[in-house]
UniProtKB/Swiss-Prot annotation:
Dimethylates a single guanine residue at position 26 of a number of tRNAs using S-adenosyl-L-methionine as donor of the methyl groups. Belongs to the class I-like SAM-binding methyltransferase superfamily. Trm1 family. It comes from the Archaea. Gene3D superfamilies: N2,N2-dimethylguanosine tRNA methyltransferase, C-terminal domain (3.30.56.70), Vaccinia Virus protein VP39 (3.40.50.150). The keyword Transmembrane helix does not apply. This is tRNA (guanine(26)-N(2))-dimethyltransferase. PROSITE patterns: SAM_MT_TRM1. CDD domains: AdoMet_MTases (cd02440). InterPro entries: SAM-dependent_MTases_sf, Trm1, TRM1_arc_bac, tRNA_met_Trm1_C. GO terms for molecular function: tRNA (guanine(26)-N2)-dimethyltransferase activity; tRNA binding. Keywords: Methyltransferase, RNA-binding, S-adenosyl-L-methionine, Transferase, tRNA processing, tRNA-binding. One of its GO terms (biological process) is tRNA N2-guanine methylation.
């Protein structure tokens, strides 16, 4: 064992963490950025929370890193309590050791299956954070029901991004009841949100995303639960299908039904709230969280100013029109000079969000080459 620091929290973790042994406690240091962002986003949500008690659940605790950081680093004037569960007895033991290490008394630990823990706590938690290895689908139904408190928050990670991005089409259809679209990684998180919205709607619950990102090998989203059939209907109105023709996307409303050649359904509405993103960015900066977490939040802050589903991949676009790829910064400057909004995206070094049309980009790239060469 070794002791490390993440954010403002000390953690005892295995020297080597692996999923190959049944009794091994899993800790992934690569996900520190994920946890930095998560604490920042939940803090932004908590800043507007009006009740005296705030109850959270991390039902897939592992080493306890996520739940313990919530318990230790979130600032709240009322009573903040965190429930952490894991089916692995070795994990439960480590979680308890990490609680002692940080002298925390606001955490309850459960040696229990995640679905059992969540099902026992119907409508109890203000926040449920599903962070599995693989797909969140097996835990989603019980996670939704456990976070049905008024204005609750459902956080969800999927590490099966190859499935969500279309590498395993049949698996995606089977697990997420949707046809994936290859290419744009943002569509992975939109597909995941779309599935969650459909799952929640059967309980007359609407899910409203307030923050989403696709980083490394995972997709992550934070969704507010809103009670009422009307809220569920409003959430479903944001679902739709996408058809990709060359570099151009066509859209079709969910209520119109599926049509051959389209993929989805995807959540086509806003997936990150501008105020939440900005507040999360300020929190991450003020707490000196990792530079990478701050950089991702800064990019998402700029992205959220532009209403575009997905992005334009300049590398793919130039390949399609048979032009050399100009420096991305030059393309951005040209777009701004022509009165368009533009931002890089956090998940693709060649990706741009802009209110320009595809035809505008083609013209600007062609003009760039005619002047340059």
């Amino acid at each position: 064992m070794k002791i490390i620091s993440e954010g403002e929290t000390k953690l005892m973790v295995p020297e080597e963490s692996t999923l190959s042994k049944k009794d091994t406690v899993f800790y992934n240091p690569v996900m520190e950025t994920n946890r930095n962002i998560s604490v920042s986003v939940v803090q932004s949500f908590l800043d507007n929370f009006k009740r005296d008690e705030f109850l959270m659940c991390d039902p897939l605790g592992g080493s306890g890193a996520r739940g313990i950081r919530y318990a230790n680093e979130l600032e709240f004037n009322g009573d903040l309590k965190v429930s952490i569960g894991d089916i692995n007895p070795s994990a439960v033991k480590m979680i308890k050791e990490n609680l002692k290490l940080n002298e925390l008394e606001n955490v309850e630990v459960f040696h229990e299956d995640a679905n059992v823990l969540l099902s026992k706590n119907f409508k109890v938690f203000n926040v449920v954070d599903l962070d599995p290895f693989g797909s969140p689908v097996p835990y989603l139904d019980s996670g939704i029901r456990a976070s049905l408190t008024k204005g609750g928050l459902l956080c969800m990670t999927a590490t099966d991004t190859a499935v969500l991005c279309g590498a395993y089409r049949k698996t995606c259809i089977r697990k997420y009841n949707a046809i994936p679209l290859k290419g744009d990684k943002e569509l992975a998180v939109r597909l995941m949100i779309g599935y969650a919205v459909k799952m929640a709607s059967k309980y007359d619950i609407g899910l409203k995303p307030i923050f989403s990102h696709v980083t490394d090998h995972y997709a992550r989203t934070f969704m507010v639960t809103e009670r009422g059939a009307g809220k569920a209907d409003s959430a479903i109105e944001n679902l739709g299908y996408i058809r990709q023709d060359s570099e151009q996307k066509s859209f079709k409303a969910f209520e119109e039904g599926y049509e051959k050649g389209y993929a989805g359904s995807f959540y086509l509405g806003e997936i990150s709230d501008k105020d939440i993103v900005q507040n999360s960015l300020e929190t991450a900066k003020n707490r000196n969280y990792s530079k990478r977490a701050v950089d991702i939040l800064e990019l998402i802050s700029k992205e959220s100013e532009i209403e575009q589903v997905g992005c334009f991949d300049i590398h793919e676009l130039c390949s399609f029109i048979k032009k050399l790829v100009p420096p991305v910064n030059d393309i951005m400057d040209n777009l701004k000079e022509n009165g368009f909004k533009v931002s890089r995206v956090h998940y693709n070094p060649y990706g741009l969000k802009t209110d320009a049309e595809l035809s505008d980009l083609v013209v600007l790239i062609s003009e760039y080459h005619s002047k340059k060469y």
